[in-house]
Amino acid sequence: MRFYVGAIRRCEAKYNLFPEIKHFCLAPTLTPYAPQGAKILLDSGAYGDVRRGRFTFNQGLERQLAFETKHQFISERIASYDLLIDEQMREDRRIKSRWAEKAGWKAVDETIAAAEFLCERRESLAPRQLVLGCQGVNIDQYETCVSAIQEIANPEDCIGL
């Protein structure tokens, strides 16, 4: 199992963790913070889009690839643009709040479509491995999402929970 560390800026300043950490998860919406030669999992940026508004799948991927180009690296892994089910906007601020079950099915469908979109571009994204996100507000939804994504995934892909 490989663990990719995110939000390292705060931890590194306090604990000087760079010598031990080799795998980082970066968001295309934030300033990258990883040592030279680190292995990068490039997140979709969907978390920040809860506040800004969602992109299309293509816009999300273009943002990820532009981020790589700007910062001169190629990710080891790249994440699909799933629809997060535990973040909502309330009165101009993002809060941690799980969606209702009925609304959760929309997130499942959108997340499966995001994985399909990325899988269709597998060859052009090489050598990056795909991280196919899964969502759901309950076990039935997660099972539906994971099962559908397993149908389109390749053995070298990762499932993101």
Please report, for each region that a protein language model flagged, where it lies by residue:
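Non-catalytic, usually N-terminal nucleic-acid engagement modules in DNA/RNA processing proteins
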Residues: 1-119, 123
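Glycine/Thr-rich beta-alpha phosphate-binding loop at enzyme active sites
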Residues: 95-104, 129-161
